[in-house]
């Protein structure tokens, strides 16, 4: 960290301090790459805002500047949830700067977050989910490797409620096909063991036997049949893309979005919709809330409780549809 011109004695450049903070989050807190990117994006925005006000050092991080930054986001039309995340990122930074002596006190401790409006997550109903899976089974019946992989991906997402980042991070050795469990590394590098069902087991077995070897072999030099193909760049990855690399988050997003377009509804049509669907269907079926919390890897029970609201809304909808006095 280097001293900044024009600031108080001992002040350091804000951009350098942010770099050090991000390094701390990566090396010591073990945050996921997705979380690290979010912090860096948020705090780079803060640094740019401070620079637009003529400030480039950490001594400028007063409560007024931080509030002005959040207000500028509100005026720009950012969602309340985004403003709340910006506030949390700024508070984490100022707390760390105070602990490391770069700030005399934590100036962000009184920074308030707007309460994000409660938005019920998108859920696919059981009939639609069955139709979606049936269409994938039919497509996989032709034996095309990508179709077999896609079926295994969707079956596992729905069966386990994994985050998409957790799914693409799986290695072959993380899956126990005898015990029907998968070992997952979630947020904060926390490990948990998540169960899945027989349909997902069958889809994964088919993928491993019939599709993954073909994906590993794909791309070997066609003009030299005797040439040994180079090993895949992610040899341990459970799910491979068409170029023998680990299947990426964007590829899974595209897959799920293309499937959910057949079932229009409120909310984003991404992999998280399958996570929401898995949680809601579990609660609809009588699963214990704390068991669902453990399955999803939520640190707080309050995060899981939103799915009880989804179940209640679905009950109200069924009541209004079916009861003559509704």
For the regions a protein language model found, what residue spans apply to each?
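Conserved catalytic core of the tyrosine transesterase superfamily
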Residues: 1-326
């Amino acid at each position: 960290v280097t001293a900044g011109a024009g600031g108080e004695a001992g002040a350091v450049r804000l951009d350098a301090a942010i770099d050090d903070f991000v390094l701390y989050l990566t090396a010591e807190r073990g945050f996921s790459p997705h979380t690290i990117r979010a912090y860096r994006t948020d705090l780079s925005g803060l640094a740019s805002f401070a620079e637009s006000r003529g400030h480039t050092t950490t001594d400028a991080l007063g409560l007024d500047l931080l509030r002005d930054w959040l207000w500028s986001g509100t005026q720009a039309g950012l969602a309340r949830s985004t403003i709340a995340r910006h506030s949390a990122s700024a508070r984490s930074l100022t707390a760390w700067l105070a602990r490391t002596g770069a700030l005399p006190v934590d100036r962000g401790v009184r920074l308030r977050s707007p309460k994000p409006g409660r938005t019920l997550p998108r859920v696919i109903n059981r009939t639609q989910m069955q139709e979606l899976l049936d269409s994938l089974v039919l497509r996989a019946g032709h034996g095309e490797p990508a179709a077999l992989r896609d079926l295994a991906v969707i079956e596992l997402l729905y069966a386990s409620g994994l985050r998409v980042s957790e799914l693409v991070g799986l290695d072959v050795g993380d899956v126990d096909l005898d015990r029907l469990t998968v070992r997952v590394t979630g947020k904060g590098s926390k490990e948990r063991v998540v169960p899945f069902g027989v349909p997902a087991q069958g889809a994964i077995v088919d993928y491993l036997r019939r599709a993954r070897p073909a994906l590993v072999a794909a791309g070997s030099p066609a003009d030299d049949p005797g040439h040994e193909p180079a090993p895949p760049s992610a040899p341990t990855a459970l799910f491979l893309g068409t170029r023998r690399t680990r299947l990426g988050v964007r590829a899974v997003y595209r897959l799920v979005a293309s499937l959910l377009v057949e079932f229009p509804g409120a909310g984003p049509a991404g992999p998280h919709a399958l996570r929401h669907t898995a949680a809601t269907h579990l609660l609809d079926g009588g699963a214990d809330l704390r068991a669902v919390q453990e399955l999803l890897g939520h640190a707080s029970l309050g995060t899981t409780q939103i799915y009880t609201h989804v179940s209640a809304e679905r009950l109200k909808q069924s009541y209004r549809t079916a009861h003559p006095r509704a």
